[in-house]
Amino acid sequence: MERIKELRDLMSQSRTREILTKTTVDHMAIIKKYTSGRQEKNPALRMKWMMAMKYPITADKRIMEMIPERNEQGQTLWSKTNDAGSDRVMVSPLAVTWWNRNGPTTSAVHYPKIYKTYFEKVERLKHGTFGPVHFRNQVKIRRRVDINPGHADLSAKEAQDVIMEVVFPNEVGARILTSESQLTITKEKKEELQDCKISPLMVAYMLERELVRKTRFLPVAGGTSSVYIEVLHLTQGTCWEQMYTPGGEVRNDDVDQSLIIAARNIVRRATVSADPLASLLEMCHSTQIGGIRMVDILRQNPTEEQAVDICKAAMGLRISSSFSFGGFTFKRTSGSSVKREEEVLTGNLQTLKIRVHEGYEEFTMVGRRATAILRKATRRLIQLIVSGRDEQSIAEAIIVAMVFSQEDCMIKAVRGDLNFVNRANQRLNPMHQLLRHFQKDAKVLFQNWGIEPIDNVMGMIGILPDMTPSTEMSMRGVRVSKMGVDEYSSTERVVVSIDRFLRVRDQRGNVLLSPEEVSETQGTEKLTITYSSSMMWEVNGPESVLVNTYQWIIRNWETVKIQWSQNPTMLYNKMEFEPFQSLVPKAARGQYSGFVRTLFQQMRDVLGTFDTVQIIKLLPFAAAPPKQSRMQFSSLTVNVRGSGMRILVRGNSPVFNYNKATKRLTVLGKDAGALTEDPDEGTAGVESAVLRGFLILGKEDRRYGPALSINELSNLAKGEKANVLIGQGDVVLVMKRKRDSSILTDSQTATKRIRMAIN
């Protein structure tokens, strides 16, 4: 109470009031701001003020043993007086200098590993090239970009578990490392960071940079991959740009780029198969990108691209709620509509059934090279404001918007019949028919659209049907703007459904994506894409089909061998041999197949003529429907490298070359794998060892069922008989011994008996 009374007295004096009101800090609010709460309100000032004091730093008492009281110049490094309110020592900034010069040194080996992302950035900048600066208007649009080059693609939760496991392995708390990438990274980092003296918190921060994708919504004109974004401040201003070529690539950009290529290839291939959805899933599950399963990448990677989103939808993952049409991403920003089927007549009097959107709606349209704002009513374009990099890009956006508007004058501008088909030879839906038609030639569309005089609005000009700019006239409702339209910033994802023809719909039934929207652009992937599915072998051309077919036979040789001998028809019908047929000249397919099948039958009938290498070599030819003919061939032709190349029926050729010494097969000079068994060992060694405990009774006896592989023999009961397939593809009848005593003699007898049974 005393104090308050005293303050009241002070306040009653006019001088006090004058001091408090005339000086700058006159507001209780300001005094409060700087004195309440733990948060420092003016860190820079506080730092200057602290550093002006003699002992601004506090340290643990142990510092007194580690640092002398005075340095070589006799300046005091720490004060014996304790820090008020704690038992720490007051220390001078000079102590830091002393410590840096004379303190203990530690191994620097961990620094490049911990600060990996920084070291790599320095390298990229060192090797990057900066070109000239150009002054021009920059059309920047905000896009969601990756600002953190060189990261893995773990979710925040996954990364947190990895970081806890690496940095604080003994802390309590449930951590379940499930994904392959989590386990690999954890193992790698634990090894790298043994005996690391850097503070765990710092290590944790740096690991986070390496593991998690950080995105920001930034204005960009130009490259959007993370190695460009890290130098955004150097390459584009408001009215200037500087050319820049990065001095290195980072895996995350490569993953994004390769993922898009893989997804496009898979969607294109799935479209032409009997069951597109099933095929797409099979391919996604059997494909690897840079050694990581594609499905794992899809689950973690936020890339939004039409083909990638179709794959995600097929896997039941959520995707963005925007929809795609004509390669533009549409996001409705206001209004609503109901859909109704309507029949319309084209300029060629062809009837089209279109789903008309009734109601007023506004959309943003964002493409790679142009963006726009579209306002439309039922079958009417009210306003379109476009901005783009060049005339061509602007025209593309205008065509898409005009078709999307469903205006009558657009439909009447169609000349000729609409009969565009997709890769599977199915007719496209009417909206895509119209789109393709005008993408080929939009002259009539633009001429018939109509023009209007325009007002002079800042930053906007008109555009004429021949795509020239104008300040007086413009196509009806269409204007070109200097400013870009920002991409949709939200990262919200919605649940979608997908039908067997890969059309993706939201829960209201609106089509968001379909295979027609997948770009036909071909690119070369930065990371190796391994398509294990035979459906994808043809993606990389004939050579890839050839190599993959033979690799598949070698990988599955154990089962192929048994089928070859027991159930050849089933083997010949395997889908893995389908792509190969396109390499065999059409006229020769049936004859080759008949010839090879006859040859194989002779091998089965005449014991001892089984030839592993020859079977592998000729097997793919037997898959075509055979023509019966007496023709014999010494070589078979396959069409690769733009011409026919020969595979010799007996012996090696550049196409198919088996090296006896290394037991490896090369196809067109590419390694196709190794044969695990030796085709030339005869029947000694392996079989006699494996057949110990069995008595060989003679040639195959069909009454005892299909031939077992040597591995399956162990399931026989004592005294039971079975046919067994031995290494050279010959089948003999054996019986499991009743007594174990005579096992030793079996290996000698087996060798003799196999020879007799065969001969």
Swiss-Prot record:
Motif window: Nuclear localization signal: 736-739
Entry's family note: Belongs to the influenza viruses PB2 family.
Name of the protein described by the UniProt record: Polymerase basic protein 2
A molecular function GO annotation: RNA-directed RNA polymerase activity
Keywords: Cap snatching, Eukaryotic host gene expression shutoff by virus, Eukaryotic host transcription shutoff by virus, Host gene expression shutoff by virus, Host mitochondrion, Host nucleus, Host-virus interaction, Inhibition of host innate immune response by virus, Inhibition of host MAVS by virus, Inhibition of host RLR pathway by virus, Inhibition of host RNA polymerase II by virus, mRNA capping, mRNA processing, Viral immunoevasion, Viral transcription, Virion
Note: South Carolina isolate has been sequenced from formalid fixed-lung tissues of a 21-year-old male which died in 1918 at Ft. Jackson, SC. Brevig Mission isolate has been sequenced from lung tissues of an Inuit woman buried in the permafrost in a gravesite near Brevig Mission, Alaska. This sample was recovered by John Hultin, retired pathologist.
Gene designation: PB2
A GO biological-process term: symbiont-mediated suppression of host cytoplasmic pattern recognition receptor signaling pathway via inhibition of MAVS activity
Annotated Gene Ontology cellular component terms: host cell mitochondrion; host cell nucleus; virion component
Keyword Cytoplasm carried by entry: no
Record text on subunit structure and interactions: Influenza RNA polymerase is composed of three subunits: PB1, PB2 and PA. Interacts (via N-terminus) with PB1 (via C-terminus). Interacts with nucleoprotein NP (via N-terminus). Interacts (via N-terminus) with host MAVS (via N-terminus); this interaction inhibits host innate immune response.
Pfam family, one: Flu_PB2_2nd
Function: Plays an essential role in transcription initiation and cap-stealing mechanism, in which cellular capped pre-mRNAs are used to generate primers for viral transcription. Recognizes and binds the 7-methylguanosine-containing cap of the target pre-RNA which is subsequently cleaved after 10-13 nucleotides by the viral protein PA. Plays a role in the initiation of the viral genome replication and modulates the activity of the ribonucleoprotein (RNP) complex.
Site for Mammalian adaptation, residues: K627
Localization terms from the record: Virion; Host nucleus; Host mitochondrion
